[in-house]
Amino acid sequence: MVRHPQHQILGVMTDFTLSAATVAPAIIQWQRVHGRNQLPWQNSRDPYRVWLSEIMLQQTQVATVLPYYDKFLEAFPNVQSLAQASLDEVLAHWAGLGYYSRARNLHACARTVMEQWSGQFPDSSQALESLPGIGRSTAAAIAAFCFGERAAILDGNVRRVFCRFFEIEGDPGLGSTQKALWQVAQHALPDTDQIASEPDSMQRYTQGLMDLGATICTRSRPDCKSCPIKPGCRALATGRVASLPNPRARRSRPERATHLLLLVRQGRVLLARRPDKGIWASMWSLPASDSKEALLQTWSSLLMHAESPLQKMAAFTHDLTHFRMLLNPWRVELPQSFDLSWFETNLDADYAWVDQDTIAKYGVPAPILPLVEASLSR
């Protein structure tokens, strides 16, 4: 049994002996009986499948991920097929999951594995962390699930569990709090004796921590009575479960207006590729400007040929991490006789005319897709 001295963590004295001696065994035993054991990526040591699930689950709930995971595997059953696909194909299959930088990193990572690792994922968390889009916690999860490595994870659910169990103060997103959480995460791992006697202990422990945070130690209304580690939970003992982790200081979310041009011609809609940096990078969306005036100026020579005046559609909002988008769509129809060579002459960005048969091939952001599909169905 590995014993750890007492450490000072943000002013809170925490006995790591308790974590090493009781937390890991309790979580492992609980996970065997009460944890989530029927998810499609479980019971697999295939790094590709585990990696895909870990990336999809970042900031996204399991129920949302499940249908996307199966469809993504149908399209890209292995790292080779993903690496050989175009970014457009990957974004099209990712559309709707949000946080699209994950899809771009996924594609880049697959190509790196093929080019630099001979098509095989590296078998250590340190090497995995060097790949595009794989951070410390994700690398540890893959290494634990696939290779049984004794590596600590610290996703959002696990941070909440440790903040409460060890009564750690501070915003979990701050560097000082993160450092403390990584320290306890490392010391709470199963000891080497347990790993030697139970070959699946790292897989069970890692999954158990995730399950505990997702189903028991939830953000609101946690089920403390069912928690396998409640005897040692400092927040439960002091009545502070509801106040930990400390909430982040609320910041006002600025609103940014964007004006969209829904250009329709014979039941087809014009899409333009977004820049390769910024919001919805490299995806296909409606042409956009920061103001109506800028939109009109850019498209003035085209709009004079429209069959009807520019039609204002209902505005709507879409929340992103740091700001709220106020989206103002404007619809206009072009006659069949309009010379399409205008687009080659006047547009700098890539563009495409899509219809009901081709829209699925393009990665269109979730807030924009209903606008496009509604016009295609007319």
Protein language model features and the residues they cover:
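Intrinsically disordered, low-complexity, charged terminal extensions of DNA damage-control enzymes
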Residues: 2-38, 42-43, 211-378
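Catalytic cores of DNA base-excision repair glycosylases
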Residues: 15-19, 25-223, 229-242, 304
